[in-house]
Amino acid sequence: MDISSKESHTPDSGEGKGEAASGGRDVVRRALGWCWTGKVSDAWCFAIGYLLALPFFLAPLFATRLLPGLDLPFHLAAADMLSKVGLPDSPYAPYYEGGLRIAPYAAHFIALVGLGKVMGLLAAHKLIVMVYVAGMPLAMASLLAACRRSRIPALLAFPLAYNLTLHYGFISFALSLPVVLWLLAEMTKLVHAETRRAFVLRWIGTAAVAILLFICHLQNFLYGVCASLAFAVLSVASWRRKLVASLALVPAFAGLAYWHLTSPPVVGQAKLTAKLAWTFLKRHRLDDLGAAKWTDDLWHRILLIPAHAMRGFVDGSHVPACRGLFLIMVAYVLVGMIAWSAPGEKKEPRPLRRRRMRMAGLVAFLGALAAYLALPHHLQEMELMTFFPRFSVLVLLMFLLLVPSGLLRLRGLFVVALPLPALVFGALYGQQLYRHYKAYGAEIAGFVAVAEKTPPGGKALGLVFDRRSSVMQVESTLIGIPSFYPALRPAKGSMVPPNYCGLRHMPCRLKVPAEFATSPWLPLSFAPAAMLPTFDYFFVRSQPPTFDPFRGYHGMVELVAQSGLWAVYRKKPGPIVSDPPPPRPAPVPAPAAIVAPAPVAPPPTPSKPVRALRGKKR
């Protein structure tokens, strides 16, 4: 009997292992051959790199229950107010009025209120930020592909999603960044649409994205429409098509005009005009310049881009990270220039379209750089704080448009290796983000602990005396933490005063004087006699030993919980009554008068007998 075939497959023979190893080598050889033939597309490499990098940049969002952001708690408080507009028992009704409308900043509030109907505000905001982080490189890749560029550099948009605007709580500005990229991509695809049907559909899509950008943020809307017009004008399409494509921006401009004409001016200020805005901008920019030379000031701002773009952490780790990110961008530029001389097919009209889009990308980059260099740091009259630094993110995003299209000429293993620098950087920086976000979560764990022990349904006020963070490099980043109370303890009666109500871009206005609630910026001005009739809970952080917030009313409050530097006090039920005056001390009897003892006369000195004296005299 021939059993050789059976023996060849026995484990002891070792031949099965050899065949498996040979099969594995064949698979690797075929894969390498497939890569070397140039069949690996740029889109395929980007998709694989995107899926590999995505978990590293979503993980930080789950490292802390409350995401960092200076203004974020105030926005969530405003969203809580909007969700209760029209309710007869709304705790905000006696003090605030407002509602959703066509205006900048509205997109974030619309998303929060809509998602808040099926989930909590904290979960809704975290979902929005997840979409934002995941969408940034996708929008960048769409723009690069529309400009006939490689999509792979778009992987560098992942770390740029964690930028200054996100950590400062400028959520609307941050959310508008991928929408700017999306608008430029849609405008480019619109002017180059090949069929009438595709042009009509693209026109509707571009108009919708422009409206979305307007209700996200005003500054990026103005930049985005100017950049998209440059992309339309510099395209290879006819002037008639360029004009019709540009008309897709008209609905968004109509929304801008409606908002500007129907919004009342800020209390105490004249109605904003172009001349007045220019006056404010010029004055504050010259104040920033001071006695320095223009060349020194501009160069100093350029050197500050790494400190501004990805700003977030006290240890300054974001600065070398941003420099490393920029070096990878420069490396992609150099590789693209070198690969440009490689042999490849030239098809019309792609070379002309690539040259035109390269010019459009340069215009977009220079526009973002001009905004960063020309705008002032603060523009209080127009409700703009930390103004020019926020455009540093846009400068780096637009720099990706300068990467030559020569990357598309790479073939074989070069294409597979192209995403590796971005992936390695993303993995390292993603882990760093996770550690910092986890440390921030530990820092605010004391507030979460006392908030969870605070009953829902009350009106709360925060008194943060030390608002500095040991993790986040953002001024006063902890000042708004008490405003998370309605999101952490949701109920019909839960309320905190939404800050910034009354500003033109905010969806709420005060019906009473602002002094009805102590400003979070002035905790030392807290007056218990004025605040106790309105508020039920008081979150206090780092109370100074020399300041007694409940002076004269200690009998009206009681400690609910304390954890770390945080404490929460509850107002006792009943009428507000001040502490009784301290009992008068018992009168101290006057000390008895001390009478000096009468002097005692010394005993008389005995004298000699007279007779004796006389006898002697004789």
Task: Outline where the language-model segments fall.
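Transmembrane-helix motifs of polytopic, lipid-linked glycan transferases
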Residues: L127-C147
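Transmembrane-helix signature of polytopic, membrane-embedded enzymes
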Residues: V28, M140-Y162
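Short hydrophobic/aromatic helix or loop-helix immediately within or flanking a transmembrane segment
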Residues: A77-K84, Y96-L121
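Short hydrophobic alpha-helices at membrane interfaces in multi-pass membrane enzymes
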Residues: K189-I211, R241-L247
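Short periplasmic/luminal acceptor-recognition loop of GT-C membrane glycosyltransferases, typified by
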Residues: V450-Q543
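Short acidic/glycine- and proline-prone juxtamembrane loop motifs at membrane-interface regions
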Residues: Y168-S176
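Transmembrane catalytic cores of multi-pass membrane glycosyltransferases
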Residues: T64-F74, G86-D89, Y96-E97, A210-V363, ...
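Signature aromatic-anchored transmembrane alpha helix within multi-pass, membrane-resident enzymes
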Residues: S405-Q431
